[in-house]
Amino acid sequence: MEPTAGACAETQGAYAVAQVNPDVPSPRCQKVGEEQKLRVVNNTEQTVKAHLGQVDLTVGPHQEATASLAFGQYLVPGVHRLAIVGQLETAVELWLRS
């Protein structure tokens, strides 16, 4: 299955970082590896909640939070939706590649 958000950026390093902005998240789509972990950075004035599989993060305004599990510990390869709820409801697509 291919992501719908368009071009997916390759994620480098230990973390796949999702930036929650007042308008749209950045990036909209990321290719992630099994050993990487999710990090959510909240660039808004309100607390946001992020949900992906078994991972739920609550992130205060202008703060960040990191999942304790690597993607491969709770997701199967494929395209997954990181749901973000705050001032707006939005999502980031994460493409877990094996």
Per-segment meaning from a language model:
Residues V40-T44:
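Asparagine-centered strand-capping/turn motif at beta-strand->loop junctions
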Residues P61-S98:
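Extracellular/periplasmic metallocenter environments
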Residues T47-D56:
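Short, surface-exposed beta-strand/strand-loop-strand elements in extracellular ectodomains
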Residues C29-K31, T58, Y74:
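Residue-level "contact hotspot" at macromolecular interaction interfaces
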Residues S26, G53, S68-L69:
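Short, solvent-exposed loop/turn positions at domain surfaces
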Residues E2-E35:
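N-terminal edge beta-strand
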Residues E34-Q36, Q46, A65, T90:
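Envelope-exposed proteins and targeting segments
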